[in-house]
Amino acid sequence: MKHNNVIPNGHFKKHWQNYVKTWFNQPARKTRRRVARQKKAVKIFPRPTAGPLRPVVHGQTLKYNMKVRTGKGFTLEELKSAGIPKKLAPTIGIAVDHRRKNRSLEGLQSNVQRLKTYKAKLVIFPRRARKVKAGDSTAEELANATQVQGDYMPIVREKHATELVKLTTEMKSVKAFDKIRLERTNKRHAGARAKRAADAEKEEKK
């Protein structure tokens, strides 16, 4: 080693230059994706380019359950409440998920309303141009129909209004986070505690 040079410290494999990942195809890939999107839009015309309608759901786990997002598909209960047969739904651009369960009335009602709004705006083309069936849209509606580009019926997240108030001693005494933790713990142990109480009762009777 001579002079004030950097000490070589490269831990390379032999012929490492043959395995370098390059991104020279990035602009072409971007163009290819764009062309593919355009081709798909033509292929699925007059259906919306964004795909089928999806429900509004709450995220899982404690971290995300306050936030809403689009789900996989509507439940059978939601479809039934909206008066849409489960076999018909996928044919008119509604995603169906038979595994999802409705755990709150509020969520069920909001998705049923979403389905009803969608159904009211829906324009159904006849399978055969000359054979118009019941439920198909009128000739005037078909003439004015256009393909929906981008997101349709997006999720509108409400911004809750906040107001400033003076803190009282009562407010300070309430520990909201601790209260939530306690309730979650009680829920988790409810079954075990009930079983223990039942066992204790049996022992007393003996």
Swiss-Prot record:
One of its GO terms (biological process) is translation. Residues 183-206 are annotated as: Disordered. The keyword Ribonucleoprotein applies. The keyword Ribosomal protein applies. Residues 196-206 have a biased composition (Basic and acidic residues). Keywords: Ribonucleoprotein, Ribosomal protein. One of its GO terms (cellular component) is ribonucleoprotein complex. InterPro entries: Ribosomal_eL13, Ribosomal_eL13_CS. One of its GO terms (molecular function) is structural constituent of ribosome. Residues 186-195 have a biased composition (Basic residues). PANTHER family: 60S RIBOSOMAL PROTEIN L13 (PTHR11722:SF20). Belongs to the eukaryotic ribosomal protein eL13 family. HAMAP family: Ribosomal_eL13. This is Large ribosomal subunit protein eL13z.
